[in-house]
Design a protein with these regions (language model features):
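Small-residue-rich helix-interface/hinge motifs
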Residues: 1-68, 169, 179-184, 189-195
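Functional transmembrane alpha-helices
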Residues: 68-90, 94-173, 190-211, 215, ...
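Positively charged, phosphate-engaging catalytic surfaces used for nucleic-acid and nucleotide handling
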Residues: 176
Length: 237
Protein backbone atom coordinates (compact mmCIF):
# COMPACT_ATOMS: atom_id res chain seq x y z
CA UNK A 1 0.00 0.00 0.00
CA UNK A 2 2.83 2.41 0.84
CA UNK A 3 4.52 1.70 -2.51
CA UNK A 4 1.26 2.57 -4.30
CA UNK A 5 1.04 5.74 -2.19
CA UNK A 6 4.55 6.79 -3.24
CA UNK A 7 3.66 6.21 -6.90
CA UNK A 8 0.49 8.26 -6.46
CA UNK A 9 2.37 11.15 -4.82
CA UNK A 10 4.87 11.14 -7.69
CA UNK A 11 1.91 11.46 -10.05
CA UNK A 12 0.52 14.35 -7.96
CA UNK A 13 3.93 16.03 -8.19
CA UNK A 14 4.02 15.69 -11.97
CA UNK A 15 0.41 16.83 -12.21
CA UNK A 16 1.47 19.98 -10.37
CA UNK A 17 4.17 20.58 -12.97
CA UNK A 18 1.63 19.97 -15.74
CA UNK A 19 -0.91 22.43 -14.34
CA UNK A 20 1.79 25.06 -13.79
CA UNK A 21 3.01 24.60 -17.37
CA UNK A 22 -0.50 24.99 -18.76
CA UNK A 23 -1.14 28.06 -16.61
CA UNK A 24 2.10 29.77 -17.67
CA UNK A 25 2.08 28.73 -21.32
CA UNK A 26 5.14 26.46 -21.14
CA UNK A 27 4.84 24.06 -24.12
CA UNK A 28 4.19 20.41 -23.21
CA UNK A 29 4.78 17.59 -25.69
CA UNK A 30 3.49 14.77 -23.46
CA UNK A 31 1.82 14.15 -20.13
CA UNK A 32 1.82 10.52 -19.08
CA UNK A 33 0.24 8.56 -16.26
CA UNK A 34 2.85 5.87 -15.67
CA UNK A 35 5.97 4.95 -17.65
CA UNK A 36 6.82 2.78 -20.63
CA UNK A 37 4.89 2.19 -23.86
CA UNK A 38 1.52 3.94 -24.05
CA UNK A 39 -1.57 1.76 -23.73
CA UNK A 40 -3.86 4.65 -24.59
CA UNK A 41 -3.01 8.08 -25.96
CA UNK A 42 -4.74 11.12 -27.34
CA UNK A 43 -3.37 14.39 -28.64
CA UNK A 44 -5.23 17.54 -27.60
CA UNK A 45 -4.04 21.04 -28.53
CA UNK A 46 -0.46 19.96 -29.15
CA UNK A 47 -0.10 17.84 -26.00
CA UNK A 48 -0.15 14.04 -26.12
CA UNK A 49 -1.92 12.52 -23.11
CA UNK A 50 -0.89 8.93 -22.37
CA UNK A 51 -1.82 6.07 -20.09
CA UNK A 52 1.35 3.98 -20.00
CA UNK A 53 1.87 0.29 -19.31
CA UNK A 54 3.66 0.70 -15.96
CA UNK A 55 1.37 2.75 -13.64
CA UNK A 56 4.25 4.08 -11.56
CA UNK A 57 3.88 7.82 -11.04
CA UNK A 58 4.00 9.77 -14.28
CA UNK A 59 5.96 12.41 -16.12
CA UNK A 60 5.76 15.67 -18.06
CA UNK A 61 7.78 16.07 -21.25
CA UNK A 62 8.35 19.65 -22.38
CA UNK A 63 8.03 20.42 -26.08
CA UNK A 64 11.68 21.37 -26.61
CA UNK A 65 14.44 19.96 -28.79
CA UNK A 66 17.51 20.96 -26.77
CA UNK A 67 18.73 23.05 -23.84
CA UNK A 68 18.71 26.23 -25.93
CA UNK A 69 14.94 25.85 -26.46
CA UNK A 70 14.50 25.60 -22.70
CA UNK A 71 16.31 28.89 -22.12
CA UNK A 72 14.15 30.64 -24.69
CA UNK A 73 11.22 30.17 -22.32
CA UNK A 74 10.96 33.27 -20.08
CA UNK A 75 12.67 32.84 -16.71
CA UNK A 76 9.53 33.48 -14.64
CA UNK A 77 7.67 30.76 -16.56
CA UNK A 78 10.45 28.22 -16.04
CA UNK A 79 10.55 28.94 -12.30
CA UNK A 80 6.75 28.78 -12.03
CA UNK A 81 6.82 25.43 -13.85
CA UNK A 82 9.45 24.05 -11.47
CA UNK A 83 7.52 25.23 -8.40
CA UNK A 84 4.37 23.53 -9.70
CA UNK A 85 5.46 20.05 -8.56
CA UNK A 86 6.18 20.95 -4.92
CA UNK A 87 3.06 23.12 -4.79
CA UNK A 88 1.08 20.11 -6.04
CA UNK A 89 2.34 18.06 -3.11
CA UNK A 90 1.53 20.88 -0.66
CA UNK A 91 -1.97 21.16 -2.14
CA UNK A 92 -2.45 17.41 -1.67
CA UNK A 93 -1.42 17.73 1.99
CA UNK A 94 -3.95 20.52 2.50
CA UNK A 95 -6.71 18.41 0.95
CA UNK A 96 -5.67 15.48 3.13
CA UNK A 97 -6.00 17.54 6.32
CA UNK A 98 -9.40 18.84 5.17
CA UNK A 99 -10.46 15.22 4.58
CA UNK A 100 -9.44 14.21 8.10
CA UNK A 101 -11.42 17.11 9.55
CA UNK A 102 -14.47 16.13 7.48
CA UNK A 103 -14.20 12.51 8.63
CA UNK A 104 -14.08 13.65 12.26
CA UNK A 105 -17.12 15.87 11.71
CA UNK A 106 -15.30 19.20 12.04
CA UNK A 107 -16.98 21.36 9.42
CA UNK A 108 -16.21 25.04 9.96
CA UNK A 109 -14.18 27.84 8.42
CA UNK A 110 -11.37 27.08 10.84
CA UNK A 111 -11.25 23.33 10.14
CA UNK A 112 -11.60 23.77 6.37
CA UNK A 113 -9.19 26.71 5.87
CA UNK A 114 -7.15 27.81 8.89
CA UNK A 115 -6.32 24.41 10.40
CA UNK A 116 -5.04 22.82 7.14
CA UNK A 117 -2.75 25.80 6.49
CA UNK A 118 -1.53 25.80 10.10
CA UNK A 119 -0.86 22.05 10.23
CA UNK A 120 0.89 22.06 6.84
CA UNK A 121 3.07 24.95 8.02
CA UNK A 122 4.03 22.94 11.11
CA UNK A 123 4.93 19.95 8.93
CA UNK A 124 7.05 22.19 6.70
CA UNK A 125 8.87 23.70 9.67
CA UNK A 126 9.61 20.32 11.26
CA UNK A 127 10.85 18.78 8.00
CA UNK A 128 13.08 21.75 7.14
CA UNK A 129 14.44 21.73 10.69
CA UNK A 130 15.15 18.00 10.48
CA UNK A 131 17.24 18.54 7.33
CA UNK A 132 19.72 20.53 9.40
CA UNK A 133 19.93 17.68 11.90
CA UNK A 134 21.00 15.27 9.14
CA UNK A 135 24.45 16.87 9.11
CA UNK A 136 24.78 16.17 12.85
CA UNK A 137 23.34 12.66 12.63
CA UNK A 138 23.95 11.32 9.09
CA UNK A 139 23.25 7.79 10.33
CA UNK A 140 19.58 8.76 10.77
CA UNK A 141 18.98 9.25 7.03
CA UNK A 142 16.27 7.03 5.58
CA UNK A 143 15.47 6.30 1.93
CA UNK A 144 12.72 4.58 -0.04
CA UNK A 145 13.36 1.19 1.59
CA UNK A 146 13.02 2.71 5.05
CA UNK A 147 9.93 4.71 4.10
CA UNK A 148 8.19 1.61 2.76
CA UNK A 149 9.22 -0.51 5.75
CA UNK A 150 8.32 1.96 8.50
CA UNK A 151 5.32 3.31 6.63
CA UNK A 152 3.82 -0.15 6.17
CA UNK A 153 4.18 -0.85 9.90
CA UNK A 154 2.57 2.48 10.81
CA UNK A 155 -0.29 2.41 8.29
CA UNK A 156 -1.38 -1.22 8.45
CA UNK A 157 -4.97 -1.30 7.15
CA UNK A 158 -6.07 1.89 8.94
CA UNK A 159 -7.44 4.52 6.53
CA UNK A 160 -6.90 7.39 9.00
CA UNK A 161 -3.25 6.45 9.48
CA UNK A 162 -2.89 6.12 5.71
CA UNK A 163 -4.18 9.66 5.19
CA UNK A 164 -1.93 11.02 7.96
CA UNK A 165 1.09 9.25 6.49
CA UNK A 166 0.26 10.47 2.97
CA UNK A 167 0.10 14.07 4.25
CA UNK A 168 3.50 13.82 5.93
CA UNK A 169 5.07 12.05 2.94
CA UNK A 170 3.64 14.56 0.46
CA UNK A 171 5.09 17.52 2.38
CA UNK A 172 8.41 15.63 2.53
CA UNK A 173 8.30 15.25 -1.26
CA UNK A 174 7.74 18.99 -1.63
CA UNK A 175 10.65 19.95 0.62
CA UNK A 176 12.99 17.33 -0.85
CA UNK A 177 12.33 18.52 -4.40
CA UNK A 178 13.02 22.13 -3.41
CA UNK A 179 16.54 21.31 -2.22
CA UNK A 180 19.09 23.32 -4.29
CA UNK A 181 20.52 20.21 -5.91
CA UNK A 182 20.16 19.47 -9.63
CA UNK A 183 18.24 17.60 -11.00
CA UNK A 184 15.68 18.43 -8.29
CA UNK A 185 13.27 21.32 -8.87
CA UNK A 186 15.12 23.57 -6.42
CA UNK A 187 18.44 22.84 -8.12
CA UNK A 188 17.02 23.71 -11.53
CA UNK A 189 15.65 26.97 -10.16
CA UNK A 190 19.12 27.85 -8.83
CA UNK A 191 20.63 27.16 -12.25
CA UNK A 192 17.95 29.31 -13.90
CA UNK A 193 18.76 32.17 -11.51
CA UNK A 194 22.37 32.05 -12.74
CA UNK A 195 20.94 33.53 -15.92
CA UNK A 196 20.00 36.68 -14.01
CA UNK A 197 23.43 36.94 -12.41
CA UNK A 198 25.43 36.35 -15.57
CA UNK A 199 24.19 34.60 -18.75
CA UNK A 200 27.64 33.09 -19.21
CA UNK A 201 27.07 31.02 -16.07
CA UNK A 202 24.51 28.99 -18.03
CA UNK A 203 27.36 26.94 -19.47
CA UNK A 204 27.57 25.39 -15.98
CA UNK A 205 24.13 23.81 -16.44
CA UNK A 206 25.36 20.43 -17.72
CA UNK A 207 28.32 19.95 -15.31
CA UNK A 208 26.17 21.02 -12.34
CA UNK A 209 23.38 18.68 -13.43
CA UNK A 210 25.82 15.76 -13.75
CA UNK A 211 27.33 16.56 -10.35
CA UNK A 212 23.86 16.78 -8.85
CA UNK A 213 22.88 13.38 -10.25
CA UNK A 214 26.04 11.79 -8.85
CA UNK A 215 25.44 13.30 -5.39
CA UNK A 216 21.76 12.35 -5.44
CA UNK A 217 22.43 8.75 -6.47
CA UNK A 218 25.18 8.52 -3.85
CA UNK A 219 22.81 9.83 -1.17
CA UNK A 220 20.09 7.36 -2.17
CA UNK A 221 22.55 4.45 -2.12
CA UNK A 222 23.84 5.54 1.30
CA UNK A 223 20.30 5.77 2.65
CA UNK A 224 19.43 2.36 1.18
CA UNK A 225 22.45 0.74 2.86
CA UNK A 226 21.39 2.25 6.21
CA UNK A 227 17.78 1.12 5.70
CA UNK A 228 18.79 -2.45 4.85
CA UNK A 229 21.11 -2.49 7.88
CA UNK A 230 18.31 -1.39 10.20
CA UNK A 231 15.88 -3.95 8.78
CA UNK A 232 18.48 -6.73 9.05
CA UNK A 233 19.27 -5.75 12.64
CA UNK A 234 15.56 -5.82 13.45
CA UNK A 235 15.15 -9.30 11.97
CA UNK A 236 18.13 -10.61 13.94
CA UNK A 237 16.99 -9.04 17.21
Amino acid sequence: MVILLICFLIFIHELGHFIAAKMSGVPIARFSIGFGPALLSRKIKGTKYCLSIFPIGGYVMLDINDISDLYRIPLRKRIFYMLGGPFGNIAFALVGIVSLNLISGNISFYSMIIDPIYQTSIYLYKIIYSIGLIFKHPDQISGIVGIVSQGSKFVGMDIIRLINFSILLSVNFAVFNLLPLPPLDGGNIVIYLFEKINPRLLKLHVPLAVTGWVLLIGLLLYATVLDVGRISAGLCA
